UniProtKB/Swiss-Prot annotation:
Pathway(s) of this molecule: Cofactor biosynthesis; FAD biosynthesis; FAD from FMN: step 1/1
GO molecular function terms noted in the UniProt entry: ATP binding; FMN adenylyltransferase activity; riboflavin kinase activity
Lineage, top ranks: Bacteria, Bacillati, Bacillota, Bacilli, Bacillales
Role description: Catalyzes the adenylation of flavin mononucleotide (FMN) to form flavin adenine dinucleotide (FAD) coenzyme. Can also catalyze, with lower efficiency, the adenylation of the toxic riboflavin analogs 8-demethyl-8-aminoriboflavin mononucleotide (AFMN) and roseoflavin mononucleotide (RoFMN) to 8-demethyl-8-aminoriboflavin adenine dinucleotide (AFAD) and roseoflavin adenine dinucleotide (RoFAD), respectively.
Keywords: ATP-binding, FAD, Flavoprotein, FMN, Nucleotide-binding, Nucleotidyltransferase, Transferase
Descriptive protein name: FAD synthetase
């Protein structure tokens, strides 16, 4: 998968493409449904492009702490998006300047740089300054450019909305099985282990301080955003299973 990093409009790309747009934190079942819909629309000569945003707008603009933490920091998100069929990821840095982009500018100055036949987004998608513009406006703004727009309904399972927010809440409570049911794939923590401590986890949502069973043995999540592990030094990955009772 090709990855481009931009701060405002994407670079011009003449390749025919179908586009998806979103934060894609976790690349959960809802995201996968959007991606699969885009893949079903995409013609053989087209690529699947995704525009994603980092950091979360509510962290970038208002420093709301819970939105700093992610299910899948950048490298993990890229890995899952590639796995689910994205050919070109445009990773957009969300800043106060970017937040001033109007809906009209987003379409005329950003999307028209891409050779798009169709855009697929979630039904709750909003965009542009104030985030008060919806799929209907996106569809209207894209009509003059002959770009189709499809919205994918929100998915629920067991009366729980599949969303990154709900999955992060499950992780914080140590409910990993419930989180993975909404993710549709395993959830891993990847970090650097040195002298029995996994660090570099500042961007991850982590479960509460405690002792947990993982696929690599028992670990302790500390209150300073490190995990005590019995693993050799270097880059390691943990698959959390469940919290152990005291």
């Amino acid at each position: 998968m090709e990855v481009s990093h931009v701060t405002l409009a994407p670079n011009k790309d003449s390749r025919a493409a179908v586009l998806t747009i979103g934060k894609f934190d976790g690349v959960h079942i809802g995201h996968q449904t959007i991606l699969n819909t885009a893949l079903s629309i995409k013609k053989e000569n087209e690529i699947l492009t995704a525009i994603s945003f980092s950091p979360h707008p509510l962290w970038a603009l208002k420093q709301i702490e819970i939105y700093r933490e992610m299910l899948t920091p950048r490298m993990e998100k890229e890995r899952w998006l590639a796995y689910y069929g994205v050919n070109h990821l445009i990773e957009t840095e969300f800043t106060s300047r970017y937040a001033e982009t109007t809906p009209e500018e987003f379409v005329t100055d950003h999307l028209t740089n891409l050779n798009l036949s169709h855009i697929v987004v979630g039904s709750e998608f909003n965009f542009g300054k104030g985030r008060d513009s919806d799929v209907d406006l996106l569809r209207d703004l894209c009509k003059p450019y002959d770009i189709g727009v499809t919205s994918v309904p929100v998915i629920e399972t067991n009366q729980t909305k599949i969303s990154s927010t709900n999955i992060r809440a499950f992780i914080r409570r140590g409910h990993f099985q419930e989180a993975e049911e909404l993710l549709g794939h395993p959830w891993y923590i990847t970090g650097i282990v040195e002298n029995g401590e996994m660090t570099g986890l500042d961007d991850y949502v982590l479960p509460a301080t405690g002792t947990y069973q993982t696929d690599s043995g028992i670990v302790n999540v500390t209150n300073n955003r490190t995990i005590e592990v019995g693993l050799s030094d270097g880059l390691q990955q943990l698959h959390m299973k469940n919290e152990l009772s005291e």
